[in-house]
């Protein structure tokens, strides 16, 4: 439901991708989670991206990537510059990124028995600048270290800088309209696969460095462990996700539980949002045809009672349960031009929800 085009201009390559997937979602009466802010103009239904790549910027195999991604309610601009180094040294990538997106997981308002989340009037404008160091791969392990300066500004739905949410509670750690921090991040990933199974594990650790007294100081970690196993004609995938944060914290840094990729049957963050979380997912897929699979799934998640520790306690104010279970069935369709996923889920409040997803669908 989209279009892709590549243009070569000298040594540079321009990739243009326009995706009209949301029009298909609208035709299936799947309502968007938050109102369209521009009055429903045609551009609001377009999801697109523009990417410019130069493989040899200064004649020494330096690579420059400039990309812009537009979603229904969010936008991201990314500039990445890579210069070659010997394989035994960490590969450097200098990154400048700016994004604007609605903050739904923590400040969103659950509706329809927690099956959807609406806008809470809080949006994040995030600017980051730093460097990524990709360590040489060792066996099945890869590692990335990054250090970045981040500046997060909080905006209302009409684009004004704000210090408090709709109920008068602070939306930043500093109490002003923005937070600043220098973040040192270490990420390690493990992956191993055979014909009948696969295993994946990732661990992220973030440390806020106190360069200035008003900047955030915190330690945050997150892990994801996934195991896939073939059971006759079927394939079972199970995963466990968890994390925690200590130290300074703004509400938008909380772990949001609920939604697609977390606990299906709930809206984004509708289960809870806390300083800690634990989410378990399992899915069994069965082949129906060569390109169509059926799926049965069970998800459960909890904020481990840490919702009350988030500044302003947004989860309690919105009546989030703190834990929840979702289960259901779905279809997975694979084609040369993309993947289609439809899930029919029910949450702990017996509210039924349809999740619809399309990836890499283009002409």
Predicted regions and their residues:
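Gram-negative/organellar outer-membrane beta-barrel architecture
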Residues: 1-202, 228, 257-264, 269-276, ...
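Extended beta-strand-rich architecture
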Residues: 16-19, 30-36, 47, 180-330
């Amino acid at each position: 439901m989209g279009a892709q085009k590549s243009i070569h201009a000298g040594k540079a390559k321009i990739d243009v991708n326009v995706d009209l997937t949301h029009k298909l979602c609208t035709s299936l009466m799947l309502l968007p989670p938050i109102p369209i802010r521009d009055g429903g103009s045609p551009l609001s239904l377009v999801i697109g991206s523009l990417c410019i790549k130069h493989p040899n910027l200064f004649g020494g195999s330096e690579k420059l990537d400039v990309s812009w991604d537009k979603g229904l309610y969010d936008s991201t601009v990314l500039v990445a510059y890579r210069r070659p180094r010997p394989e035994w040294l960490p590969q450097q990538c200098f990154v400048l990124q700016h994004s604007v997106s609605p903050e739904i997981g923590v400040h969103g308002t659950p509706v329809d028995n927690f099956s959807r989340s609406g806008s809470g009037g809080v949006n994040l404008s995030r600017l980051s600048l730093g460097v990524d160091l990709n360590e040489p791969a060792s066996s099945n392990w890869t590692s990335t270290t990054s250090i970045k300066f981040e500046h997060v500004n909080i905006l209302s739905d009409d684009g004004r800088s704000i210090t408090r949410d709709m109920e008068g509670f602070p939306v930043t750690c500093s109490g002003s309209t923005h937070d600043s921090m220098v973040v040192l991040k270490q990420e390690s990933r493990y992956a191993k696969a055979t014909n009948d199974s696969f295993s994946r594990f990732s661990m992220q650790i973030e440390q806020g460095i106190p360069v200035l007294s008003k900047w955030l100081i915190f330690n945050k970690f997150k892990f994801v462990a996934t195991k896939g196993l073939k059971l006759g004609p079927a394939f079972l995938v199970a995963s466990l996700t968890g994390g925690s944060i200590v130290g300074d914290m703004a509400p938008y840094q909380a772990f949001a539980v609920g939604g697609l990729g977390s606990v299906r049957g709930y809206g984004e963050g509708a289960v809870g949002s806390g300083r800690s979380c634990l989410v378990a997912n399992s899915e069994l897929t069965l082949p129906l045809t060569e390109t169509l699979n059926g799926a049965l799934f069970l998800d459960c998640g909890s904020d481990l009672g840490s919702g009350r520790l988030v500044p302003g306690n947004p989860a309690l104010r919105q009546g989030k349960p703190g834990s929840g279970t979702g289960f259901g069935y779905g279809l997975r369709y694979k084609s040369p031009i993309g993947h289609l996923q439809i899930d029919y889920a029910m949450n702990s409040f017996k509210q039924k929800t349809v999740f619809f997803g399309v990836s890499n669908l283009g002409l």
